Amino acid sequence: MKKKVFFLAASAIMLAMGSCTNDVLDNVQQVDSSLPQTRATASNNWTYAYVLSEGTWHVAPPSSPGSIVRYDNNWTKKSTLEIGDTGNDLIQYGSKLYCAVSGHDLTADNGGIWVLNAKTGQLLTPQMKQYDDEKTGHKAMPRHLAAANGKVYISFYSGAVMSIDTMNYAKVNYLELDATYSEGICVGKDNKIYVCNSGNTDDTQAGEGTTISVLPLTLDDETQITVPKNPKLIAAYSANKMYFNVLGDGGMHSALYKFNPTTPNVAPTLVTEKAGGFAIGSQYLYTADIDWNTTDYKTIMQKVQLSNDDTSDFTDDPGIYVRFQRNSQSI
């Protein structure tokens, strides 16, 4: 399972990122300007934490459902919301939380979006909102979320993108991409949508994709940037620097890359290897990865100085670690 943590206060939010590596980061902020600043876990200057757990991923139904757990700042559990098969992403935009539930697969028809009041944790939708995916003829399989200008943008695993209105949650725009198995999504500083594609147009399984799609906010056109294989997450740091990571395959380590969106034809530059997940802070970008070739699944955490991309270990403190179990985790 993977988990995401939001520390919610008047102007505070901390995200412990989720990816296939179950990474845990401290003092990390979302790049989206709609999100408040972060707080360290050692500080109690926050009101609630929201923890997203994906549940049991891609096992024969019935699977263990994903959940959103709400804690107070004494880490007392206040509520648990079961959200269905595979909770995949959780963002705050304005006064609301949006949660993407992928569902079991592309034809399972059990994926959708939950909307919650960020202050109270109460549902704002009586049931999960589901959307038709014209590319598959089934209900959409949402993967990741971004937000801007009163809309939430959703990447679909089929290789499509949809925007929804934040007032009534109705579909606004939709575009089928020249790709499949779309994953991470963000809004660039140039007000364009960037989507990582884990599959190319005719791929029948994820992992071989080599493109990032670039779209206007209206989702009525698509261009592509060629990148190393299997891009996963993406974030904008500045007008001329964006970061993304790739998961590669069994023969290649994960890695972090950067590129300049103003010169999309210039090949991305490798920043560091071993980056299964990442998030951007005020001075550093933080990465986390698991070395699956070690018997104890060694956790690798690095920080990248945003001014010059110098990379160093995130911490030598043996008290900071990630523990994994089959059906539960400590973070």
Question: What residue spans do the PLM features occupy?
Answer:
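Bacterial Sec-dependent N-terminal signal peptides
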Residues: V5, A16-A49
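Conserved beta-propeller blade signature
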Residues: Y48-V51, K96-C99, K151-I154, K192-Y194, ...
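Acidic, serine/threonine- and glycine-rich low-complexity intrinsically disordered segments
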Residues: M162, M167-L285, D291-W292
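Blade-loop segments of beta-propeller domains
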Residues: K78-W114, A118-R143
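Structural motif
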Residues: H58-V69, L106-V115, A160-S163, D202-S213, ...
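A short beta-strand motif characteristic of beta-propeller blades
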Residues: W75-E82, Q122-T136, A170-E176, D220-T226, ...
